[in-house]
């Protein structure tokens, strides 16, 4: 199966699993996905994740986080897509919900939140917004 946007697929799997109130979700592994998951874990949006090998293929098992019976992530939106890439300079990085959410940015210094990119003085490709 040819997948044109693996990041959007990962975000959709997380959204669907939370809508179905699943405890965990399994996705194919990649370095970029693991970098995004590390940010989600550090910011408190997911419980944990771990890389596993099943049938000779690497995948990531994500433990989702809930609070008061509802998912912690209320919105998970892909911004830059393969057909239309979205880039932002350090001065134009978005503030999500006035600082209550995060934007994940792929920069020359790695994948980071928009706050880290602004503090580091770098811009980059806006991957997704989490609130």
Swiss-Prot record:
<comment type="subunit">
    <text>Part of the 30S ribosomal subunit. Contacts proteins S5 and S12.</text>
</comment>
<keyword id="KW-0689">Ribosomal protein</keyword>
<dbReference type="InterPro" id="IPR047863">
    <property type="entry name" value="Ribosomal_uS8_CS"/>
</dbReference>
<dbReference type="InterPro" id="IPR000630">
    <property type="entry name" value="Ribosomal_uS8"/>
</dbReference>
<dbReference type="GO" id="GO:0003735">
    <property type="term" value="F:structural constituent of ribosome"/>
</dbReference>
<comment type="similarity">
    <text>Belongs to the universal ribosomal protein uS8 family.</text>
</comment>
<dbReference type="InterPro" id="IPR035987">
    <property type="entry name" value="Ribosomal_uS8_sf"/>
</dbReference>
<dbReference type="GO" id="GO:0006412">
    <property type="term" value="P:translation"/>
</dbReference>
<comment type="function">
    <text>One of the primary rRNA binding proteins, it binds directly to 16S rRNA central domain where it helps coordinate assembly of the platform of the 30S subunit.</text>
</comment>
<keyword id="KW-0694">RNA-binding</keyword>
<dbReference type="GO" id="GO:0005840">
    <property type="term" value="C:ribosome"/>
</dbReference>
<dbReference type="Pfam" id="PF00410">
    <property type="entry name" value="Ribosomal_S8"/>
</dbReference>
<dbReference type="GO" id="GO:0019843">
    <property type="term" value="F:rRNA binding"/>
</dbReference>
<keyword id="KW-0687">Ribonucleoprotein</keyword>
<protein>
    <recommendedName>
        <fullName>Small ribosomal subunit protein uS8</fullName>
    </recommendedName>
</protein>
<dbReference type="GO" id="GO:1990904">
    <property type="term" value="C:ribonucleoprotein complex"/>
</dbReference>
<keyword id="KW-0699">rRNA-binding</keyword>
């Amino acid at each position: 199966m040819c997948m044109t946007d693996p990041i959007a697929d990962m975000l959709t799997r997380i959204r669907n699993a939370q809508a179905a109130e699943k405890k965990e979700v399994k996705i194919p592994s990649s370095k970029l996905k693991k970098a995004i998951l590390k940010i989600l874990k550090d910011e408190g949006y997911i419980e944990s994740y771990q890389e596993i090998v099943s049938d000779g293929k690497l995948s990531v098992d994500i433990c989702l986080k809930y609070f008061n019976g509802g998912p912690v992530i209320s919105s998970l939106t892909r911004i830059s897509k393969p057909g239309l890439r979205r880039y932002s300079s350090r001065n134009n990085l978005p503030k999500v919900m006035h600082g209550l959410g995060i934007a994940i940015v792929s920069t020359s210094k790695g994948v980071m939140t928009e706050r880290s990119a602004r503090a580091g003085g770098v811009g980059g490709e806006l991957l997704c917004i989490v609130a």
